[in-house]
């Protein structure tokens, strides 16, 4: 995220692609780990691969429907792809948690874009 803020998008993308390789290996070893699926979704989203990102998030939600990170990041993906109603569905899941993920997704919905 810091590289992106400094305008070093190419360098950030290189790190995300490298992370994907390690995450895919971890996912192969333990495909039922929602945290790994969340990170795979995040890294794919960051390089602009929204289709694969959404797949990883949705598989993660099948395993852990209330996973805070997945619900937040999938909601942000929906905001970034103009599916606000779907983003609000993810926000509803986070509603009772009184957590940072709820606040960040709510801000993304209100602003119409994600800071990530």
Regions found by a protein language model. Name each.
Residues 29, 63, 94-97:
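Structural marker of alpha-solenoid helical repeat scaffolds
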Residues 35, 69, 101-104:
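Start-of-helix register in tetratricopeptide repeats
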Residues 86-116:
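Terminal, low-structured helical/coil segments at or just beyond the last alpha-helical repeat
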């Amino acid at each position: 995220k810091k590289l992106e803020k400094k305008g070093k998008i190419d360098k950030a993308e290189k790190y995300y692609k490298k992370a994907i390789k390690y995450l895919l290996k971890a996912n192969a070893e333990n495909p039922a780990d929602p945290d790994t699926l969340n990170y795979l979704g995040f890294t794919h989203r960051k390089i602009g691969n929204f289709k694969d990102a959404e797949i990883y998030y949705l598989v993660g939600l099948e395993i852990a429907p209330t996973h805070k990170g997945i619900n937040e990041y999938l909601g942000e993906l929906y905001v970034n792809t103009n599916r606000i109603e779907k983003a609000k569905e993810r926000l509803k899941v986070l509603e009772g948690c009184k957590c940072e993920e709820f606040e960040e997704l709510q801000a993304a919905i209100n602003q119409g874009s994600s800071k990530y």
